[in-house]
């Protein structure tokens, strides 16, 4: 014997259970099937009532702040948070968590509807791929950030990193909930640390669909992509009432931080949307270019646009005369799959174009000069715009395509006072450290440090080609002549004689920066027919697809911010 008690009739092996207990269960009509004891008819009724009560609570919770506040949301031209969820996600895919959460008990919340504690959290699918959601509900306590709601949000961030889901914030919030934070502020603020540590791990999107100030103000600023709705959204470090109390300024939300301010002046917003639905469409489209998390494959789409397609229209769009301007957006439309381009910050720092497109179905980030604005010269804002865009592409292994027609950086007292060296260094730093495939096409001018930052050969270009009009030089021929031959020009007779000499010297200098001389020195991979630019971009991306770079050991680089 092994010391264990033998089973007894109607009992258990150790005799501690059974007998009368089992008989009582049988007498009650429950019986036992495979060791599972069933409930009574009365218990079934009770369970049904509990289920009904649960359903009623959830239905009430989905009513948000109540009919009056929902109507007010619609009067302002805004969708409710739950209508936004329906627009954002593929139909029937959203799973909510924390619906039954409510605000902490305070005198200010007594008798008020505080379902979900003013923030809807959960996961759903966008184009068939999972994404996490943290969406503030302005109908519940003005969407303010409460202790319980932020606990829900923190869990969504944790799970998003664990499961590899992009995080989407739908922002319509008065900010931190003052009545809960007073006396407990030392335990708040985790959101900004968590978002910073998540950066580059999963994509983070902050869609501003209403108020976004104070506590929520930094949320979009820490996101990768920030669309705002025209006319109904605002974003600021402090609300207008706090600003009035602190500075005496009388401002409207729109004047201080409306979509036009951040899309055209500050550069915090990436796009300006017509309405909520348009904004949410932008979120879906942005994520269509992104992997779900770092290391995942990029989403490839089937495409009918032939990779070998030529475009003779480029002969018409880009003038051979380097002094004539043109719209680079027309060039981009000719080169990308089906002419579809998703611009980033199109209304800010306009001398440089950034955005996403596909080549042969594969996502790529496009950085392009815009000769229509200052001939494409790079200033402070353009440097910042490009630096962040390159950062995002590099973080998620999205290849970069550079379309170059740049006379260099803007010079002068104004830009020096604004810190052009510091901001330009940011651009240089990020292009230098980016390890993704880089394909560079030089259409016309590639002068000075502008050439370096726009995917220059020494900055990791994996495939660099030029048109017959390409010029790579420390500066343009005109500038070089003014410096190199200033005494000779000064000695020439003013008027026609001096201009004739200048023209002759410019011709000599231009002959020294002929693209075929550059090709002769093996400083460029090829001179190409402009009509075959798309073909070469796709070839370059295919060639460099397996790129791997091992960086020197270090903790992190010191970005010149």
Which positions does each model-derived feature cover?
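Ligand-binding clefts of soluble mixed alpha/beta catalytic domains
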Residues: 2-27, 31-561
């Amino acid at each position: 014997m092994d010391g264990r008690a033998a089973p007894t009739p109607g009992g258990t092996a150790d005799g501690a259970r059974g007998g009368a207990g089992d008989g009582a269960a049988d007498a009650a009509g429950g019986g036992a099937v495979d060791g599972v004891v069933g409930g009574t008819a009365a218990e079934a009724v009770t369970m049904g009532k509990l289920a009904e009560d649960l359903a009623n609570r959830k239905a009430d919770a989905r009513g948000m702040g109540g009919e009056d506040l929902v109507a007010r949301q619609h009067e302002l031209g805004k969708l409710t948070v739950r209508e936004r969820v329906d627009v954002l996600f593929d139909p029937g895919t959203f799973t909510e968590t924390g619906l039954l959460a409510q605000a902490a008990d305070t005198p200010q919340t007594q008798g008020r509807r505080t379902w979900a504690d003013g923030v809807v959290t959960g996961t759903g699918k966008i184009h068939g791929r999972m994404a996490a959601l943290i969406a503030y509900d302005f109908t519940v306590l003005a969407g303010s950030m409460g202790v319980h709601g932020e606990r829900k949000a923190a869990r969504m961030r944790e799970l998003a990193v664990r499961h590899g889901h992009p995080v989407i914030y739908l922002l319509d919030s008065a900010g931190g909930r003052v009545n809960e934070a007073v006396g407990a502020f030392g335990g708040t603020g985790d959101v900004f640390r968590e978002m910073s540590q998540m950066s580059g791990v999963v994509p983070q999107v902050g869609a501003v669909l209403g108020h976004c100030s104070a506590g929520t103000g930094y949320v979009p600023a820490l996101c990768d992509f920030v669309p705002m709705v025209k006319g109904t959204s605002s974003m600021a470090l402090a609300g207008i009432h706090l600003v009035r109390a602190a500075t005496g300024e009388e401002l409207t939300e729109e004047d201080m931080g409306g979509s036009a301010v951040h899309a055209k002046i500050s550069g915090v917003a990436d796009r300006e949307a017509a309405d909520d639905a348009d904004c949410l469409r932008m979120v879906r489209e942005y994520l269509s270019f992104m992997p779900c998390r770092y290391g995942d494959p990029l989403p490839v789409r089937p495409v009918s646009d032939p990779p070998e397609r030529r475009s003779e229209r480029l002969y018409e769009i880009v003038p051979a005369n380097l002094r004539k301007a043109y719209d680079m957006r027309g060039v981009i439309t000719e080169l990308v799959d089906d002419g579809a381009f998703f611009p980033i910050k199109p209304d800010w720092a306009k001398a440089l174009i950034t955005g996403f497109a596909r080549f042969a179905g594969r996502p790529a980030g496009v950085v392009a000069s815009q000769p229509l604005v200052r001939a494409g010269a790079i200033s402070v804002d353009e440097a910042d715009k490009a630096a962040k865009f390159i950062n995002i592409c590099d973080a998620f292994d999205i290849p970069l395509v550079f379309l170059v027609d740049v006379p260099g950086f803007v010079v002068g007292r104004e830009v020096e006072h604004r810190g052009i060296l510091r901001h330009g260094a940011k651009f240089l730093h990020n292009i230098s450290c980016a390890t993704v495939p880089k394909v560079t096409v030089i259409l016309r001018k590639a002068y000075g440090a502008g050439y370096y930052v726009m995917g220059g050969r020494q900055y990791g270009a994996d495939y660099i080609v030029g048109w017959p009009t390409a010029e790579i030089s420390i500066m343009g021929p005109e500038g070089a002549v003014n410096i190199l031959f200033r005494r000779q020009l000064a000695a020439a007779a003013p008027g026609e004689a001096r201009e004739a000499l200048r023209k002759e010297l410019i011709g000599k200098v231009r002959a020294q920066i002929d693209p075929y001389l550059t090709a002769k020195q093996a400083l460029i991979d090829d001179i190409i027919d402009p009509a075959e630019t798309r073909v070469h971009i796709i070839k370059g991306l295919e060639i460099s697809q397996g790129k791997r770079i091992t960086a020197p050991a270090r903790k992190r680089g010191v970005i010149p911010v």
